[in-house]
Amino acid sequence: MMADDLPIEPLVSVIIPTYNRPAYLMEAVRSVLAQTWRNLELIVQDNASERDPTPLLTALGDARLRVIRHDRNIGQTANMVTGCQRATGEYVTILGDDDLWHPGFLSRLVPQMVANPDVVVSFCAHDYIDVNGRVDAAGTTAINRKHRGGLKRGVHRDIVRLGLVSRSICALSAAVYRRDAIEWDRVPLDLAYGFDNYINYLAARTGKACYYDPEHLAKVRLLPQSASQDAASIRGRELNGRTCMGYWDTFYRDQAVASGRPYFAMKRSDNALRVLLCRLQKQGPRASLRELMALRREGMLSPLSLLYHLRYGKN
């Protein structure tokens, strides 16, 4: 076979949303450009960082890389979604600006999607790393055991279960999506938390399949001041609770993912209880009673979902 006759790798779009992390960003970008899968476009979405990373990125001299810099902060979710909407590849993946890939990340995951047209998301195991890039062995073992314990390599049909219930697909940086399978314009741009859950919901509602590779091909960095740490305050916990309550309610009401309804109801009530507790801590019993009545009227708390919650607990 002549070189010109070799099959052409389909284009993969890599989106890196970034804000004020120039050093980590450069590490993430280099891990993308070092991929053995060469046919990719890398779109760095800078969300109005104090220091413009464009000169640093341009100096890398790679034509596959382009930078989109917003003149104002448009929010984390909007930054991710607009990047995905700009993508032109057959496949798209979102890498955190502080996360890293093994050089074979794309070469291991994308061919499985090419070979299996029904697969809309391909994902792998991942390591947790600290601020200095050291692997957190205990955390890595715990997360993979909790979400992927016993999961076999190969194609799996139930994205509702793996993406939303067991949360086996729990890190965007460790997953690749078929771009045209995801309805990107359905993602609420003001979503404060749970972007990964929402993308997996959109993948699940296609009724298609996913592929799992148990190799640790991605590294997810845990930082002291990550967005998840905002939930430590009462205000942050209430915002987190309301946001999550809202999207679990969306999932619950969607017939396309009906197999997960008992679990979605539990998660909805779990977050409603979190909102209720925050209101009690902030404003006292009278305000929390009003909140309780409002949540009951909205259907966020029901006896059935509370019974399920008591039986199965948190996941």
Range-by-range predicted roles:
Residues 147-233:
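Conserved nucleotide-sugar donor-binding catalytic segment
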Residues 53, 70-87, 97-100:
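Glycine-rich, basic loop-to-helix element that forms the pyrophosphate-binding segment
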Residues 104-141:
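Conserved donor NDP-sugar-binding/catalytic core segment of glycosyltransferases
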Residues 92:
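Short aromatic/hydrophobic "clamp" motif used to bind/position activated sugar donors
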Residues 50-59, 100, 104:
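Acidic helix N-cap motif at the loop->helix transition within catalytic regions
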Residues 38, 46-55, 72, 96:
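A conserved acidic beta->alpha catalytic loop
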Residues 192-195, 205, 216-224, 229-260, ...:
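Catalytic core of nucleotide-sugar-dependent glycosyltransferases
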Residues 1-33:
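N-proximal low-complexity "stem/linker" segments adjacent to membrane-targeting elements
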